[in-house]
Amino acid sequence: MNDFLIGILGSLAASAILLVLGLLRGARPMWRLVAACSRLTKTGLGRVYLHQSSAERDLARDLEGARWVKVLAGRGNVLTREVFSPLWSAEAAPQSVQILLPDPGPREDSWLDRRSQEVSRFDPGFSLHLLRSQVRTNLDYVARVTQARDGVELRTFNLPNNCRVIATDRAAYLTFYSASAHGRNSPCLYARAPGILYTAALRQFDAAWAHATPALPTPLA
């Protein structure tokens, strides 16, 4: 029994060490070690990106051929970039795309405003209304997409704006926003299905989706 517990603790310690090394180095050989250790601990952790933005090439590949896609984002700029363009075309479209973005409407208990204040502490060009404006632009973009093709649902939420989740039926990209950096500069975890991290990412999304509000569509011009 003691040997079993020591083995489990050893695996967890090794996983933690490899995770730190992966964050420090971000090299592909290190990813293989992280993935091997994750199979022992059943976390499903496959890769660690130093910055969320450096994951976009792999994310684009995983989005191609996905049966469904779930996105929970703090701003949603990635939805308008090239990485997501295959989802908006009829040829490569998945069966279902669910998108959650923050509620940009004025309210006393706005978590979006809390994140704006947080970012403004390290980015002097980030005004209180800038994030709200950017979210509105991305909501408008996706709302128009929902009218142009089937299978896309858009909702808004007012919950702690502290992570981004992009998940498919095969994997999930999970970013925890730092209080001292933009999301694009925060580390991103790649979790394969099945696994503890993948399940946690889906639970995070589903909980937010259940308490979200359907976004009003913007009429096409």
Feature roles, as predicted:
Residues M1-L33:
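Hydrophobic, helix-forming membrane-interacting segments
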Residues D109, V119-F126, S186, P217-A221:
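N- and C-terminal low-complexity/disordered segments
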Residues L112-N162:
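HKD-type phospholipase D/PLD-like phosphodiesterase module
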Residues Q134-L139, L159-D169, A212-A221:
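Short flexible/disordered coil segments
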